[in-house]
């Protein structure tokens, strides 16, 4: 008999780690305080009537250029090694997987975060996630940021609950139709 799948979805910032992920390595590399950086993000959000997530992504790029801090996929992933977790997080995944096995279910872990995907990919817990849905940048052939590739704001997070539930995990030109199509409960993957 096929094991039922139980999906556990996590936010990242202030849920698995103790503060916003940018505050461990990125903001210090700019020589700024967290309050100054987020203050600028909020001021831009208000002045431009802008999505707060796009505003922080813009400010990350703007401030990195201004302070001559190189940011690439690789540097973001290295910043992931600086993330600090709440007590028990590092052992949680293996413990809950073992419990799932004991009770006859397969446990899958997913991230649905407004944080930076590349930083999460560089964390020591990234290997436990089947899929990481988070804000992401597009890079040129030199590895430099070109544009926001994906922004996961607070209301957009719900689409990932449906993606996981229906088993439409890939984001591509064909997935929107599959995602929006009615799927009877008994045909859903999770």
Where are these regions (language model features)?
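Alpha-helical substrate-recognition element adjacent to the catalytic core
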Residues: 1-145
């Amino acid at each position: 008999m096929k094991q039922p799948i139980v999906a556990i979805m996590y936010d990242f910032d202030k849920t698995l780690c103790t503060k916003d992920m940018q505050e461990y390595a990125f903001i210090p590399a700019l020589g700024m305080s967290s309050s100054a950086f987020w203050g600028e993000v909020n001021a831009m959000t208000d002045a431009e009537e802008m999505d707060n997530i796009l505003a922080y992504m813009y400010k990350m790029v703007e401030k990195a250029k201004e302070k001559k801090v190189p940011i690439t996929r690789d540097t973001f992933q290295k910043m992931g090694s600086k993330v600090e977790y709440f007590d028990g997080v590092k052992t949680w995944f293996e413990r809950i997987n073992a419990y799932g096995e004991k009770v006859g279910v397969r446990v899958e872990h997913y991230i649905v975060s407004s944080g930076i995907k590349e930083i999460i990919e560089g964390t020591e817990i990234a290997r436990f996630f089947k899929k990481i849905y988070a804000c992401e940048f597009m890079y040129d052939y030199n590895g430099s940021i070109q544009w926001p590739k994906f922004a996961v704001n607070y209301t957009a997070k719900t689409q990932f609950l449906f993606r996981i539930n229906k088993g439409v995990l890939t984001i591509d030109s064909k997935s929107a139709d599959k995602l929006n199509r009615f799927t009877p409960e008994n045909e859903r993957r999770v």
